Amino acid sequence: IMDEKISHPYERRYITLTNYLARYNLDAAYRIMLMAHWDTREFADQDLNPENRFLPILGANDGASGVSVLLTLAEILHTLPPLNIGVDLLFVDGEDMGKTGDPEKFGLGTQAFAKNVPEPRPQFAICIDMVADQEQHFPIEQFSLQQAPEVVHSIWLLANDLGFPQFENRMGNAVMDDHYYLYKYAKIPAIDIIDF
C-alpha cells in the first residue's frame, strides 16, 4: 500500500491517494507490470443529461473493469506463480480527477508512483482501462505505439493469433491514461488497452 497526500486539483483541501502494488516472483530481474485505476470520476461531466453532470459516476466500466481483470490475474498468479518472470499488479488512485483541457490533473496516482518505482523495475507495463463494454473495440492507442511499439505489436499479434477480433489493427485515439504518465515520469514503456 502506497499513500500519497496531495492538494486536491481543484479544491482547497488535501486528499490522500492510495495505490496498491502486488508483486509476484520478487527475485526475478525481468518484470512486467499490469495496471488499472480503481477510482471513479467525482462528477459525470460528460453525461448527456446536464442535470447529472455534478453527480459521481458508478464506474462499472471506467474504473471497475480494469480492476476486475487484475483481480482475476491475482487469483491465477497465486495458484500458478510465474517462474521465469516477475509480475507486478498496480492498482492506482486518482486517475480520473482531471478536467478536459487540464491533462496534468489526470493520472495523479501514477504520477506519485512514478516518483518512487520500487526495484527491480518492470521492463514494460500494460494499462487496462474501460474493457467491459458489450461491444469491445481495442484499436491501437497512439501514445502506446510511440512509447512501446514492440509491446503493442506483440500483444495485438498474439490477440489476433488467439482469435480476439476486438484487438483491431488500426490507429485509435491518443488517450492520456495512466500509461502515458508512467512513461512520462518513470520512463517505463507502457501501453493502454482501452475501448475509448
Language-model segments: residues:
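Solvent-exposed loop/turn segments at secondary-structure junctions
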Residues: 6-9, 26-28, 38-42, 94-98, ...
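Glycine/charged-rich beta-loop-alpha catalytic/anionic-binding loops adjacent to active sites
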Residues: 45-56
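Structural recognition of the beta-strand scaffold that forms the well-ordered cores
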Residues: 21-23, 31-35, 59, 88-91, ...
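Acidic/histidine-rich catalytic neighborhood of metal-dependent amide-processing enzymes
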Residues: 54-150, 174, 178-179
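Active-site-adjacent substrate-binding region
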Residues: 3, 7, 124, 133-196
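Sec/Tat-exported extracytoplasmic proteins
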Residues: 24, 42, 74-81, 91-93, ...
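Extracellular/periplasmic catalytic domains that process cell-envelope and extracellular macromolecules
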Residues: 13-16, 25-28, 81-84, 118-120, ...
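A non-catalytic alpha/beta surface segment that caps or lines the substrate-entry region
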Residues: 1-27
